[in-house]
Amino acid sequence: MLQPKRTKYRKMHKGRNDGLAWSGNAVSFGEYGLKATAHGQLTARQIEAARRTISRHVKKGGKMWIRVFPDKPITKKPIEVRMGSGKGNVEYWVAQIQPGRMIYEIEGIPEETAREAFRLAAAKLSVTTTFVTRTVR
């Protein structure tokens, strides 16, 4: 599972996830990409599940890049615990996603294969996505 090796602080404020992705919004490494079209959070488990799906579909061909990293801790209090007594423990890690953010990139495979792999992977993610192709070399 993806998570930071160490952080300055253990817990984080909830914050707001609005606006568009100004960085990480172009196909930079590969030939094809999976781009987010909505706001949301991707958990480390979702990122890994989609990665496995893509890897299984393309088999040995192609190279893949994961363009997001879950660096925000989400806390949760134990079940049947009364309110108060501080913030809960870190339960999992998420990557905050804005519309336009590139999530995965791939190269070295035919477009039909890439399109199908990303379609299968998109079913594992909690944000709506679209398939994009590199425009400028």
Curated annotation (Swiss-Prot):
Keywords from the UniProt entry: Ribonucleoprotein, Ribosomal protein, RNA-binding, rRNA-binding, tRNA-binding
Any one GO MF annotation of this record: tRNA binding
GO BP terms: translation
One Pfam family per UniProt: Ribosomal_L16
GO cellular component, one term: cytosolic large ribosomal subunit
Coiled coil: none
Xref: CDD domains: Ribosomal_L16_L10e
UniProt keyword tRNA-binding, yes or no: yes
InterPro entries, per database record: Ribosomal_uL16, Ribosomal_uL16_bact-type, Ribosomal_uL16_CS, Ribosomal_uL16_dom, Ribosomal_uL16_sf
Subunit structure, interactors included: Part of the 50S ribosomal subunit.
Similarity-based family: Belongs to the universal ribosomal protein uL16 family.
Function field: Binds 23S rRNA and is also seen to make contacts with the A and possibly P site tRNAs.
Protein name (record): Large ribosomal subunit protein uL16
Source organism of the structure: Xanthomonas oryzae pv. oryzae (strain KACC10331 / KXO85)
